[in-house]
């Protein structure tokens, strides 16, 4: 049974390598027409260059999972900008995708919490569709849309969860099927529990990303891990990818929803051990603040457990 690990966006061990450099709309509007285009191109070029640097880094360190930054392209979905970011950077996107395919990396995106399908406002749904399309277009430009996923949360409850869930199913029909096929859902830390999110996934045929920290912060009343985990595993069978779990640990007892800089191995061990009964390879995305540093420290700590063997920088063969 293999446990594989990855991290989010920015490799902390690389110098000045943020793939999420920004160009605010306020700054954009103060520029001349030619300066605006140059600024868009310059920031996007820097973010793609740093994304490529990070991909080389994960390959070199034997880290098989990576989540792209959602902020690679500035102002990509702003209604007053909406620019063609693929054509001028087709070579860069292709180079990134080529490395992903060559080294069989598992990649993903995670749009922010405002990309949701439970809102009663049509413009919110329209913006969600636009944002999902932006992420899909980047994957498509890389040539990896058929092997990557775009992960979001169910959304808000708006005072009535059942009505909101009904709207989710209706509003989701606005999303092109080719994008929905690459979509996953994750339980959140305040509103929709693991059981509620998993139920939506089962009904809609969407893979379920289980966040163990969120499960702890927003527990399910009528289900436990022995019920949730095998059902979660089953939701991934349709797209042929390994089940995926998000890992982080609370910053403190008084801030249980906040992510700590590193992952407390003792906090996550119960869920790692629970997977042994299903003998299934699992992919884990580390969501700690120290990103790759947290991943490497955690894998080092776990590899010291009797019966666990480290196969690569981010890969463990778990004890039988």
From Swiss-Prot:
Major enzyme class: hydrolase
Q: Which domain of life is it from?
A: Bacteria
Q: What is its EC number?
A: 3.-.-.-
Q: Species name for this entry?
A: Bacillus velezensis (strain DSM 23117 / BGSC 10A6 / LMG 26770 / FZB42) (Bacillus amyloliquefaciens subsp. plantarum)
Q: What is this protein called?
A: UV DNA damage endonuclease
Record GO terms (molecular function)? endonuclease activity
What keywords are annotated for this sequence in UniProt?
DNA damage, DNA excision, DNA repair, Endonuclease, Hydrolase, Nuclease
Q: Which SUPFAM superfamilies match?
A: Xylose isomerase-like
GO BP term (any one): response to UV
Which protein family is named in the record? Belongs to the uve1/UvsE family.
